[in-house]
């Protein structure tokens, strides 16, 4: 646990227009150079695929379209002014009307990154929480092959050779084989909660485990836990 909270924190830190007072007094605020370079400096696309829980491929695809559409609506400011031309604005409207064919859907996030980069003149950060849920539910309900193809195409388009992408962070509970949906991605790095680099970022830290075991009178089970 802690995945969604961390993704929310990343969005709040990087996103243009963020409330910088949220980080006042925190450890990261002591690194002024880092904050000046990154805090509130980038457009951010942030979606959670937790809601793609369906008993059929058609319903799952509809839920995914809804998630993309709602995220695109969050960036409607790009329709203001003249930074985007009429063709760009038509592309944006195709993402928010809900009338999205599968070809539009698999390019939807890449399209949105391109539009955001053009408007802000900044590379775009992409955050995808619970990326594995659609595949887990598809496996349970017998449409895994269809869903893995859709998710692979969506991810490859936005994450691979996308000149508008600054970087992306994905979180999930299951270790989905890299070959299934991340084929050919460059600079792909996998971390688990067992990695020392993040062992104090997710779940409980060591002192918290000891405190809970002591509270329940289970101190002798520390090594097992």
Q: Model features per residue range: what roles?
A:
Residues 1-225:
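Phosphate-binding site recognition
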